[in-house]
Each structure stands twice: as structure tokens, then as C-alpha cells.
Amino acid sequence: MTVLTAAEPPNRIEVDMDAPSLDTDSSCTSLSSSVQRYEYKHGRRYHGYHAGSYPFPNDKREQDRLDMIHHVYTRILNDRLFLAPLDPRGKAILDIGTGTGIWALHMGDAHPAARLIVGNDLSPIQPSWAPANVRFVVDDVEKDWVDRHPYDFIHCRYMAGSIKDWPRLIRQCYAHLRPGGWLELQESVNVMYSEDGTLPPDSFMARMMHGLIVACEKSGRTMDPAPSMEKWVQEAGFDPITKHRFKIPVGSWPKDPRLKECGSLMRVNFVEGVEAFTASLFTEVLGWTPEEVAVLNTGVREEAMRNDIHAIFDFVVIVAQKPY
């Protein structure tokens, strides 16, 4: 078993002392009716196909947030869509939980010589237009896969809180890869921290993340798969395995321009996305009242706008090959 650890990120993210805090006011073509049916609750739209499998909304506001997160993750990877040592030409590629389809669409644009790029998701929210080598499928990846064709590359990103049985999913990835094919898992470690003590453990942001982890565990889904991904791919038989770790700040406080850009977008993610995170899980699973959730959401938004709080997520990428 060959496990490689890529270069770690810098020890500390340097703070831009001149960065101001901000005020919260400033900133398939044929689908069955069951797939197209949606649920509406908490003032938001949720998927109806296998309802409850994904605890977050799928409406336009959420789609915009997901596209923003795609940009953050791509920038953190130095404008790369993937880290696997793969030449996409002539290859069949699968994007698990494609969401809006933005990763698959960008792959199709960037690699027109790729033979096929498939994006699957529970929600049919992908655009009807796409590059010629891209197609979208509505499917539940936790069930037996309908598509029996082998892939050369499987990409799975930002699926925290969505999967009940990660080891089974990874075994299915292994089974549907050609020998020599690659699996890439990208997830943030959903425990926030600061390197300078500016994020207290009882902060609203830390409490929200802890609540999400507890609620997902009660629902039978893990909100923090990143720490276990390396073990799961080892157990599935992948070899070699490379682990990359990056830092994602929340806020515009970093000096580094790229991290400042990513942090500014992550601030928007919290300010505008906190309602999507908490609406269903905190009321339906944790039993909070709407008033209690509203207080938490307000606290999260206010903390996210402060540049004297230097919150960070770690971002983990696992690149694993199926042996020949």
C-alpha cells in the first residue's frame, strides 16, 4: 500500500491588518414526474426524488451558492478542476452529485477530447445546454448504479451530509472504474478553527458547524467525511493514494490575494447560505424552534462579517488509483 502525503499548506495564513470588517447589509431531457416533483418547506424548495436524502434546498438561491463554492474550490486548487494525474482525452468521466453541473460543464469545455463526462444528481437542476461530450443523469448514487459502463475517472466533491454509507459508495466507485482508473474525493473538514485564537469554541459559527454534524449523524449521514476518506479508499483496495490538504479562510482578512478572494466568497457563503444549512436540520432533527434558529443565523452572519475573527476550514483532496 502506497500512501503519499502532498506538501502541506503554509503553517499560518498571514492576516491583512488593513482589511475592514463589513456590515451585513453591504454585500436527461426526458424526466418522470417523480423526478421533477419538489417539496416546499421553510420557505425554500427541496428535491422530491428520494425525498430526505439531501437535507439542503435545491432552489435558485442554493444553486447560485453551489456555483460559488465551485469557484472557491477551483481557486484553492490553483485553478485546477482536478489533481489526479489524468489526461482526459478519450476518457470516460463521472461526476458524483453534480449539483448544478458546473464542474462537468467546465470539464467539457476545458477538455473537448474527453470521450464522455456524466454528471449525476438527485435533482434535475442542470442546464439543458451542455458541451457535446457532457450528459446529465438523475440517479441516487447510494443505490445500485444503473450505469454499468466503466469509467476512467470518478470525481466526488462537496457531498458532506448527503451520504449514508461512504464505504459502500467508494466500493461502487472502485467496481465501476477501469483498472488504472482514478478516484478523486474533495471535501472540507467541517470543524472550524483559527490559528490565533480569534474563533472561540462557543462562537455562533462553531456552534452551527457542530449542530450540523450532530444533526446529520442523527439522520444517519456524516457531515464530516474528510477525516475518514483516506481509510475508506485504502479499505476499498485503491493503491497508490495521495492526500492533499489546503486551507480555506472565511473572510477577507488574509493577505494572500487568492486566499482573500476565496475567503471573501466563503463569507458570502455563510452570510447568504446559513439559512439553507440550518432550516431543515436544526428544526426537524435537533428540535430547535424557528426563533432559536433565527438567533443562531443572525449570530453566524455577524461573525462572518468580522475581520477580527480568522476562521479557517481545512480542505482535503484524496487521489486514489485502482490497481491494474
UniProtKB/Swiss-Prot annotation:
Pathway: Secondary metabolite biosynthesis. Signal peptide: none annotated. GO terms for molecular function: methyltransferase activity. It comes from the Eukaryota. Keywords: Methyltransferase, S-adenosyl-L-methionine, Transferase. Its EC number is 2.1.1.-. It is an enzyme of class 2 (transferase). Coiled coil: none annotated. SUPFAM superfamilies: S-adenosyl-L-methionine-dependent methyltransferases (SSF53335). Disruption phenotype: Abolishes the production of most pyranterreones, but accumulates pyranterreone 5. Induction: Expression is positively regulated by the cluster-specific transcription factor pytR. GO terms for biological process: methylation. Belongs to the methyltransferase superfamily. LaeA methyltransferase family. Methyltransferase; part of the gene cluster that mediates the biosynthesis of pyranterreones, a family of antioxidative compounds. The first step of pyranonigrins biosynthesis is performed by the hybrid PKS-NRPS synthetase pytA that condenses 4 malonyl-CoA units ato the acetyl starter unit by the modular PKS of pytA. The acyl chain is then connected to an L-serine through the amide bond by the modular NRPS of pytA. A tetramic acid is formed and released from the PKS-NRPS pytA to give pyranterreone 5 with the help of the thioesterase pytI. This is Methyltransferase pytC. It comes from Aspergillus terreus (strain NIH 2624 / FGSC A1156). The gene is pytC.
